[in-house]
Swiss-Prot record:
Cleaves both 3' and 5' ssDNA extremities of branched DNA structures. Its main location: cytoplasm. It comes from Frankia alni (strain DSM 45986 / CECT 9034 / ACN14a). InterPro entries: Endonuclease_NucS, NucS_C, NucS_N, NucS_N_sf, tRNA_endonuc-like_dom_sf. It is found in: Cytoplasm. This is Endonuclease NucS. Its EC number is 3.1.-.-. GO terms for cellular component: cytoplasm. The keyword Nuclease applies. The keyword Cytoplasm applies.
Length: 220
C-alpha cells in the first residue's frame, strides 16, 4: 500500500465531471490497483476513488488514473508532505458473524434460493485476496461468484468487485465470471452501484431458509 499526503486538486472525467479544489489530502494506492482520495473527515468514505482494474500514469506532478471504461482521475500534486509504501501481506479478512456464517451454510445447500438454476461448485473459493463465499454455476453453465452479507452495502459490492477481478484472471475457471451479492437486505446505494458494475443482487429470507421453506429472492 502506498500512502501519499499532499496538497492536491483532483478532477474526475467520465460519465460526468467533478472537481476537488486544492487542499491537503491523503491518496491511497492499494495493491489491488485501487486509488482513493481522503480528507480528514467522512469516516472511511473517500472523496473520490477509482476501483480496480486501473492504470496509474505518473507524470511531473500529475497522476492520471484510468479504468477499463476510460474514466479518469487526474490528481495534480502541488506539494508532497509524505510518500511511503508498505507491504501488508495477505489479509485473513473479517470473520463472519453468526448469521452470515449460517447464511453461507444454508445457501450452499440451497443455491437456487439465490437464483433459479444455480448449483454449487465450491464454498470459500480462494481468490488470492480472500475467499469468495460461494462459487456456483448457473443454468447456462456460466460461473457465478456469490458474496453473502447480512446487510448488503457498498462495501460488499466493492469486495465482490475485487474478487471478480481476480476470478476473471483465474485460468481454472470459465470466463467471464458473474457476480451476485446475496443478503437479507440491500441498501439502495448498494443496488445502484451493483447495477453500475453489472452485478446481481438477491434478497434472501434467513428465517425461511432455516425452516427449509421455499425462499423467493428479489433479483435486481
Amino acid at each position: 500500500m502506498r500512502l501519499v499526503i499532499a496538497r492536491c486538486s483532483v478532477d474526475y472525467v467520465g460519465r460526468l465531471t467533478a472537481h476537488l479544489p486544492s487542499a491537503v489530502r491523503l491518496v491511497l494506492v492499494k495493491a489491488d490497483g485501487s486509488v482513493s482520495i481522503h480528507a480528514d473527515g467522512r469516516a472511511y468514505k473517500p472523496l473520490n476513488w477509482m476501483s480496480p482494474p486501473c492504470v496509474i500514469a505518473e507524470e511531473s506532478g500529475v497522476w492520471r488514473v484510468t479504468n477499463k471504461a476510460a474514466e479518469q482521475l487526474v490528481i495534480t500534486l502541488e506539494e508532497i508532505l509524505h510518500d511511503s509504501s508498505h507491504e501488508l501481506g495477505v489479509d485473513p479478512g473479517l470473520r463472519k458473524d453468526g448469521v452470515e456464517a449460517h447464511l453461507q451454510v444454508l445457501l450452499a445447500d440451497r443455491p437456487d434460493a439465490i437464483a433459479p438454476g444455480l448449483t454449487l461448485i465450491r464454498r470459500e473459493y480462494e481468490t488470492g485476496i480472500g475467499p469468495v463465499d460461494l462459487l456456483c454455476r448457473d443454468s447456462d453453465g456460466s460461473t457465478v461468484a456469490v458474496e453473502i452479507k447480512r446487510k448488503g452495502e457498498i462495501d460488499g459490492v466493492e469486495q465482490l468487485t475485487r474478487y471478480l477481478v481476480r476470478l476473471d484472471a483465474d485460468p481454472a475457471l470459465p470466463h467471464p465470471v458473474r457476480g451476485i451479492l446475496a443478503a437479507q437486505s440491500i441498501t439502495p446505494q448498494a443496488r445502484l452501484l451493483a447495477a453500475d458494475r453489472g452485478l446481481g443482487c438477491a434478497v434472501v429470507d434467513y428465517d425461511e431458509l432455516r425452516g427449509l421453506e421455499p425462499s423467493i429472492p428479489t433479483l435486481f
